[in-house]
């Protein structure tokens, strides 16, 4: 399983603490390890549990290297934060593999390969409410292939801190995801050729709303350098995605438990 989706959700909530893109006085390093339980792919009613491993390096000048987003630069002001990065897009296989999204139920749909991806993310603190937006564009892998076209994804979010005290910190956010036509067609559409090779009927997906949902995280400090975080992510697939024949369940829930060590 690629840890990116869940870890990005956790990172977006951590914007409240301004930990990921702030200009540090010194180099910052962090390591993360945990377990995640999530649907095998977006729309699946099958579930899988897999380890989640990651790391992050942030320089005093805002340059960062992150296993979830990639290589980039970030800035943190009093209320506004911004980052731009180059990384790798998500992938999906048409067979069961313990460390990758996908399912044998998708046999014949072909593999969606990871490819270079450009991203920008911004957040504004409006009196304790974090308004966030993340735009990602995956580069074309093969324009003649059903799963290789360039696509664009946008996430809009509103987050806030619900509790901070002796039992740690609880943060929550609501979000909506949007995609262009190529994104929806790549992840939820079924072409005529795919229909002949798989068990799904042909389906042409259009640009629009992918899903709407919420994240809830609880972070508990263990000592000066270590904290344990849990995340619940719930998404409801909207019409263009939810009506796809590959979608077996529109309500998608994922959970993550992660230990983070910063030094």
Model features per residue range: what roles?
Residues 27, 37, 47-53, 57, ...:
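Residues that define the transmembrane beta-barrel architecture of outer-membrane proteins
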Residues 18-19:
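N-terminal signal peptide c-region/cleavage motif recognized by signal peptidases
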Residues 139, 143-227, 236-238, 263:
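Outer-membrane beta-barrel transmembrane domain signature
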Residues 40-44, 66, 71, 107-111, ...:
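Outer-membrane beta-barrel domain signature
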Residues 35-39, 59-61, 86-92, 126-128, ...:
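Transmembrane beta-strands of outer-membrane beta-barrel pores
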Residues 33-37, 53-59, 69-75, 118-124, ...:
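Residues on the lipid-exposed face of transmembrane beta-strands in outer-membrane beta-barrel proteins
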Residues 61-65, 80, 128-131, 166-170, ...:
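Repeated loop/turn-to-beta-strand initiation elements of outer-membrane beta-barrel proteins
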Residues 43-48, 95-100, 143-150, 183-191, ...:
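Outer-membrane beta-barrel translocator domains and adjoining extracellular loop/strand segments
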């Amino acid at each position: 399983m690629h840890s990116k989706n869940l870890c990005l959700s956790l990172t977006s909530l951590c914007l409240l603490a301004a930990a990921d893109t702030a200009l540090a006085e010194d180099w910052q390093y962090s390591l993360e390890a945990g377990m995640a339980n999530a649907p095998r792919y977006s729309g699946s009613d099958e579930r899988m549990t897999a380890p989640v491993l990651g790391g992050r390096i942030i320089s005093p000048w805002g340059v960062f290297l992150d296993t979830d987003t990639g290589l980039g630069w970030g800035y943190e002001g009093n209320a506004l934060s911004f980052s731009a990065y180059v990384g790798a897009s998500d992938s999906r296989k048409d067979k069961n593999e313990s460390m990758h999204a996908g399912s044998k139920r998708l046999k014949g749909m072909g593999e969606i390969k990871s490819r270079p991806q450009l991203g920008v993310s911004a957040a504004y603190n409006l009196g304790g409410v974090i308004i966030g937006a993340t735009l990602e564009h995956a580069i074309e892998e093969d324009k003649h292939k059903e799963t290789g076209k360039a696509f664009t994804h946008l996430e809009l979010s509103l987050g806030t801190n619900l509790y901070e005290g002796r039992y740690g910190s609880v943060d929550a956010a609501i979000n909506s995801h949007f995609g262009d036509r190529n994104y929806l067609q790549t992840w939820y559409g079924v072409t005529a050729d795919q229909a002949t090779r798989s068990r799904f009927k042909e389906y042409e997906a259009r640009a629009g709303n992918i899903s709407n949902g919420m994240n809830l995280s609880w972070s508990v400090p263990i000592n000066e350098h270590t904290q344990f975080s849990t995340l619940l992510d719930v998404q409801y697939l909207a019409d263009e995605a939810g009506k796809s024949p590959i979608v077996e369940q529109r309500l998608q829930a994922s959970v993550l438990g992660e230990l983070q060590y910063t030094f």
